[in-house]
Amino acid sequence: MSKKIRKAIIPAAGLGTRFLPATKAQPKEMLPIVDKPTIQYIIEEAVASGIEEILIITGRSKKCIEDHFDKSVELELELEKSGKEEMLKMVRDISDMVDIHFIRQKEPKGLGHAISCAKTFVGNEPFAVLLGDDIVYNEGKPCLKQLIDCYDEYKTSVLGVQTVEAKDVNKYGIVNGIHIEDRVYKVKGLVEKPAVEEAPSNVAILGRYIITPQIFKILEETKPGKGGEIQLTDALLNLISEEAMYAYDFEGTRYDVGDKLGFLKATVEYALRREDLRDEFIEYLNTLKK
């Protein structure tokens, strides 16, 4: 009997250099899309997918992430005194959303190393990974829940993927796989950021994973790759030789909020989905066309 996916890891130890100077003194994960930090969108997706415990892997200068998801007694008292019940509920809901733990990645040694820091937290269970640079909007089933359902069927690691333009394959980990049923690929190999002419496909890994605990032993044995970092893709490639792996082409609009243009697109489109902002915002956008 396969184990339920209960735990999720969110790596958030990066320096966010692409967003300097905004990220000089605050984590990029706390930059807001409209009025909510990017990392909160990701945690809400995990909770909506049935995740019960989350480990956020942080680096230095990331304490405000912990503060955001902790109780804020002074703020709650002030809102209560002011009779701002709706805001009070919103603030309390953030800290009550899910059981969140934190651990620090002491050195920036890559995504694979960050995942290995979660070994004690995960134990001997399959787990989810949600990367902080990827927000996925879906009106129906959340992206992570789609992967969990695929895991429940195949009982092994599942990569969240979508097709990208051929010219963009050098930005992603690319899947070499066989399409076996609607939205599902059997993974035969992985290539990290290949040259366009060397890419086995245009099926790209996009920030969501379900991984079996066997990955931790492999990560311990994985040698540093590009830039002296331990790459998760290298470890996943070795995992394929030990067990089956699948990729699921998830439904939803994915935003790369680690990229300035992607961040702007997410901000505009999330604002347009807000009933309290949409009409006036559209009016404003229309003035820009003149």
Which residues fall in each region the model found?
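Short catalytic helix/loop segments, enriched in acidic residues and glycine
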Residues: 25-40
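Short, conserved catalytic or adaptor-binding loops enriched in Gly and charged residues
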Residues: 88-99, 179-184, 238-240
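Active-site metal-binding loops of divalent metal-dependent hydrolases
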Residues: 15, 134
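Conserved core of the sugar-phosphate nucleotidyltransferase
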Residues: 135-217, 222, 226
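Active-site acidic Asp-centered loop
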Residues: 130-132
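Conserved N-terminal catalytic core of the sugar/cofactor nucleotidyltransferase
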Residues: 2-10, 18, 36-126, 137
